[in-house]
Amino acid sequence: MEKIRKNFGFGCMRLPMIGEDVDIEQTKQMVDCFLEQGFNYFDTAHGYLQGKSELALKECLTSRYPREDYVLTNKLSGSYIKKEEDIRPFFESQLAACGVDYFDFYLMHSQSTTNYQHYRDCRAYETAFALKAEGKVRHVGISFHDRAAVLEQILTDYPAIEVVQIQFNYLDYDDVAVQSRKCYEVCRRHGKPVLVMEPVKGGSLVNLPDDAKAVLDALHGGSPASYAIRFAAGFPGMLMVLSGMSSMEQMQDNLSYMKDFTPLNNAERTAVSKVVEIFRKQDLIPCTSCRYCTDGCPKHISIPDLFAIMNTKHTHHDWNADYYYEDVHTGPGSRASDCIRCGQCERVCPQHLPIRQLLQDVAKEFEKG
């Protein structure tokens, strides 16, 4: 962990795209800017962009910079392994895809009650600790999406876990379902450094309702993202706050306030609390656009995009939402009403959303004709 230079990391789940492919030239520019400004932590996973994230990092980062210049985190994704014997070949394929001979951090991906049992059955933790002993992994940790009691159980079962990545932002801090604060407190009790994901909640804390945006604008300070990321970074024990940046503009904004980080002051914390109150009064879908739900959807429904359109209509009363629903994000056989209720999406959703019911709500809103 001593290699980490600053507490802000480049999350590589939302890289800039040109059509279906990663925008390699812009990603190279972003990697260069990130390293030049003194930051060096990169986070990926095989499932990010259907494997293209790992390959992009090889082309934009690992083939262009010495290994000691960056910290690279990858994850063991349970959907790619069926048994213990699958783990090492999968791990070696990740090393090859990323163009490295070791990972600084290797996380058991998206741990929850269901996933955790699968990892135990496959002896995934034991294999990861063995990889560390062999020098192929420097630190073993988990990324986590569930209730605090489940996290407590995992850290009790495997005290050798070194770091925990949790969803943490000011909107989820006291949320009953996500339990960010309670999960953070479990990490602190166990003495585990915390890696923060979703500090802007998939963009929800950037694209604010108009009245919430007005509260932050009155501070005459930074961008909406700056308050969200600084909120997360300001807690003790936060080793890293990740941001899934998809443009140079986003990166430059983030680096401007994280290069010489300062926690939120009292006025800023009060403003953030007001924003939370505004959100609580709105009936928004708490989707973070991770897109885990779309890979296995037999109807190819663009679930996160439909939820985003629904939120946009409720938040901004935007008539354009109907256009985007009809002409951009749906097609024959892939509208919300085409859901066959198989439940595949709900089994992989880190937010545990009732997606089938929500799609019915979307259909009711946009398919009135």
Task: Please annotate each region the language model reported.
Residues I18-G19, D32, E36, I81-V200, ...:
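Glycine/proline-rich, positively charged
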Residues C12, H46-L49, L107-S110, F144, ...:
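Residues that line or immediately flank small-molecule/substrate-binding pockets and catalytic motifs
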Residues K58-V71, Y125, Y158-V164, L255-F261:
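Short, electropositive alpha-helical surface patch
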Residues E25, D32-L35, F39-N40, E59, ...:
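Structured C-terminal cap/extension of enzyme domains
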Residues M1-Y70, T127, A133:
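N-terminal binding-site loop/beta-alpha segment at the start of enzyme catalytic domains
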Residues K6-G11, F42-T44, Y70-N74, F103-M108, ...:
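Hydrophobic faces of well-ordered beta-strands that scaffold small-molecule active sites
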Residues Y48, R64-E84, H109:
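Structural motif corresponding to the early beta-alpha repeats
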Residues S53-L57, R147-E152, M251:
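Short, well-ordered alpha-helical microsegments
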